[in-house]
């Protein structure tokens, strides 16, 4: 009976820590945020509204302090937040008017060649990159699969106003201009909307063909690799090919979405940009992401990649604008690299719990047999 009392006391305090203290500490260190939202227009409306609310609170606090300087600064920040809220609203209202179904890929290619090739390449259609290093701050991306991994409305917003689409207006402004300029709109709304639809059609059409070619080559290479192995059964070969295919696809998406800034040294991947250039450009060196899945967890990364400002307010990391499929691929890649033994670890944990349960039964039985002789 005494042992049961001790057992229940241990269970009580363990449960208190596990379901009480630990979740509370987690909520303090990692405050809850709104869920992942791939409707970027709605997400921006919520974000800018939140920014205005923060600045209004700061203005109230400044008025309470009585400091004229603090009041002036707070009022200026509030007016800026309100102007950005209105400008962001107008941006997404413009994007909402675009009929992407009427885009012409060939005209989009012509527009790209006339406006974008100074910085960007599209190797899938034979357009080489003009800038191949990070001397301007970061290596400009090749846009061969931009139409596959980015949300089409986000891409259009990025073309029209990069700073607002990327949520980096706190970092880049007129005094510190962003590397990518806004697309030169004509002022004719109908023509501008058609041009944007054409550009997106070009990106999506190019990405579709590029992905097909990439998949076919990858599959052929894997089949050739395992065809030489006579020890494996056909079923085992098929399973391994599928596993490596998924990993390579996920890595490919990561490289295009994140690989210009971040290393993953556990997988031998090094960013295409020079870290010192990135530090000067962003204000800090982007972290290696090898173990980020273990330190932050998949749920945190889902929210952070979708909208970095939700987790680290004021961070220089831009919102990437990945669609849901591409974001899942990025997280799966990081999980495979940083937590490759997750399934085995979880399964081993169950076995250990069973082992200790059986051991406890034998320990109690042994204790009773020993003490029964003494009494």
Task: State where each predicted segment sits.
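Electrostatic cytochrome c docking/interface patches
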Residues: 31-63, 69-112, 127, 208-254, ...
């Amino acid at each position: 009976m005494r042992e049961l009392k001790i057992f229940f006391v241990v269970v009580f305090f363990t449960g208190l820590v596990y379901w009480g203290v630990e979740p509370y500490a987690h909520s303090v260190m990692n405050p809850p945020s709104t869920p992942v939202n791939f409707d970027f227009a709605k997400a921006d409306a919520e974000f800018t509204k939140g920014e205005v609310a923060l600045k209004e609170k700061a203005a109230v606090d400044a008025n309470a302090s009585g400091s004229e300087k603090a009041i002036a600064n707070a009022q200026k920040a509030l007016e800026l937040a309100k102007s950005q809220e209105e400008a962001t609203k107008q941006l997404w209202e413009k994007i909402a008017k675009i009929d992407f179904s009427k885009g012409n890929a060939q005209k989009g290619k012509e527009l790209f060649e006339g406006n974008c090739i100074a910085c960007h390449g599209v190797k899938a259609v034979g357009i080489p990159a003009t800038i191949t290093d990070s001397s301007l701050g970061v290596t400009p991306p090749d846009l061969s699969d931009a139409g596959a991994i980015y949300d089409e409305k986000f891409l259009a917003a990025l073309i029209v106003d990069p700073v607002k689409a990327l949520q980096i207006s706190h970092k880049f402004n007129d005094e510190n201009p962003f590397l990518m300029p806004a697309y030169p709109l004509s002022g004719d709304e109908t023509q501008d909307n058609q041009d944007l639809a054409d550009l997106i059609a070009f990106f999506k059409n190019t990405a579709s063909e590029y992905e097909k070619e990439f998949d076919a080559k990858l599959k052929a290479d894997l089949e050739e690799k395992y065809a030489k192995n006579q020890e494996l059964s056909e079923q085992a070969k098929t399973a391994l090919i599928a596993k490596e295919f998924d990993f390579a696809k996920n890595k490919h998406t990561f490289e295009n979405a994140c690989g210009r800034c971040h290393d993953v040294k556990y997988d031998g991947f090094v960013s295409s940009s020079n870290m010192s250039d990135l530090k000067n450009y962003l204000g800090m060196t982007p972290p290696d992401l090898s173990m980020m899945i273990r330190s932050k967890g998949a749920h945190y990364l889902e929210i952070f990649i979708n909208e970095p400002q939700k987790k680290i307010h004021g961070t220089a990391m831009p919102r990437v604008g990945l669609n849901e499929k591409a974001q899942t691929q990025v997280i799966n890649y990081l999980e495979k690299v940083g937590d490759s033994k997750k399934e085995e670890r979880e399964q081993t944990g169950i076995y250990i719990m069973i082992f200790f349960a059986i051991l406890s039964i034998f320990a109690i039985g042994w204790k009773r047999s020993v003490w029964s002789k003494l009494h």
